[in-house]
Each structure stands twice: as structure tokens, then as C-alpha cells.
């Protein structure tokens, strides 16, 4: 398995449990590490890997239309989407919600999911 990564992707979505968080889209910083088959490296063919520009563009668009209470639920949504739509075999999703707590630079969540596990 090879890995591609997209780190520091900025996106916005409606997320949070407090009313003031739900008044506007909240900024997020997302890191994705995506496990892909070695075929792309062997064939030098973008058709055999995850097209990261497509992942970024599509994910940003989808998140603007979604609604989550918890970062954990958002991370699970992203992991399921990457595994289901892009032929990935493994994914690590890290989401940071910057500046949400006074005196704390960032809070967030990180999950890993494997396509072969339930």
C-alpha cells in the first residue's frame, strides 16, 4: 500500500453543539492520509490512484451543504466517503477547529479507518 496525503486543507461546514457555532459555517483544517494500491506507482497512471484535486474540490463543496454536531461524526463521514468513492483501502482523517476555545490554539479529532474492517 502506498499513501498520498492532503494536509492543511481549509474547508467550512456547519458544525457545533452550541447555538453560536451554528449561526455560520465554521472554518476547519483537514488532513487526509489515504492508502492507495501500488498500481499507480507501477503504471504512472492517474486513473489508478486517488485524484487529490478532485477530493479537495468535492469535499469542500459537500461540506458547505452538510450539518454536523460533532467533529467525530464529521470525521466518520469523510472517512466513509473517501473509502467508498475513491478506491482507497485505508484513511486517516484529522480535523482541526482552530480558535474555538479561548487560550487554546486548536482542538480536533483524528480517526483511522480500514476498508476491510467494519
Model-derived features: where do they sit?
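N-terminal, polar/charged subdomain of small-to-medium soluble alpha/beta proteins
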Residues: 1-118
Amino acid at each position: 500500500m502506498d499513501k498520498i496525503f492532503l494536509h492543511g486543507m481549509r474547508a467550512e461546514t456547519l458544525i457545533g453543539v452550541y447555538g453560536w457555532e451554528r449561526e455560520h459555517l465554521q472554518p476547519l483544517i483537514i488532513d487526509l492520509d489515504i492508502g492507495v494500491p501500488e498500481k499507480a506507482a507501477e503504471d504512472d497512471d492517474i486513473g489508478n490512484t486517488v485524484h487529490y484535486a478532485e477530493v479537495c474540490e468535492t469535499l469542500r463543496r459537500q461540506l458547505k451543504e452538510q450539518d454536523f454536531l460533532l467533529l467525530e461524526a464529521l470525521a466518520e463521514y469523510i472517512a466513509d466517503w473517501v473509502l467508498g468513492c475513491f478506491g482507497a483501502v485505508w484513511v486517516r482523517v484529522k480535523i482541526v477547529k482552530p480558535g474555538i476555545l479561548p487560550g487554546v490554539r486548536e482542538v480536533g479529532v483524528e480517526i483511522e479507518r480500514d476498508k476491510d474492517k467494519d
